[in-house]
Regions:
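Hot-dog-fold acyl-thioester-processing enzymes
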Residues: 2-102, 165-168
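HotDog/MaoC-like acyl-thioester-processing domains
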Residues: 1-29, 108, 112-117, 121-168
Length: 168
């Protein structure tokens, strides 16, 4: 049962967008922004993901969650991050990625609840050509997942190495 819920609720929307436009280092100008997605968070997904990966009562037990400081079920942070990746994969363009370098920050600002509809906004925070590998650039993006009310539920800075069109 867990496998079915996780695959249906996370796996299906996690497919890559059809024929995404490749983004090279030069495409990541300071004003680059993109947004998209509509991910519907279900109670079944929160419960099953919580039971499998983060078995806290406010993720796994509606009665206990109602009595918690959250006043109801909330999604595990690792589920919110996974949904962010599913939304990212659905964007109509994708970096020509050499490697991910990591996250500089990750904040979970507002709890995600069953019934929420999440969307993603991505903008360039910084980009510079690599000194050691001038055929690539280092791009830092600010990513923000919002609920249907426009409230941030996850914000992060992600750094990656992206292929350049030319050698500099």
């Amino acid at each position: 049962e867990i496998r079915r819920v996780v695959l249906e609720d996370i796996g299906s929307p996690n497919r890559l967008a059809a024929d995404p436009t490749p983004l090279y280092f030069e495409d990541y100008a300071a004003d680059f922004k993109i947004a998209g997605g509509a991910y519907h968070v279900t109670e079944a997904l929160v419960l099953e993901f919580g039971r499998r990966f983060d078995p806290q009562p406010f993720h796994t037990d509606p009665v206990a969650a109602a009595k918690s400081r959250f006043g109801g079920l909330i999604a595990p942070g690792c589920l919110t991050f996974s949904i962010r990746q599913a939304l990212y994969n659905q964007l109509p363009c994708r970096p020509v990625l050499v490697a991910g370098l990591g996250l500089e920050s990750l904040d979970l600002a507002t709890p995600v609840r069953p019934g929420d509809v999440l969307s993603l906004k991505v903008e360039v925070e910084d980009s510079r050509r690599s000194k050691s590998r001038p055929d690539t650039g280092i791009v830092t993006t600010r990513q923000r997942v919002e609920n249907q009310n426009g409230e941030p539920v996850l914000t992060m800075l992600a750094k990656m190495i992206v292929q350049a069109r030319d050698a500099g």
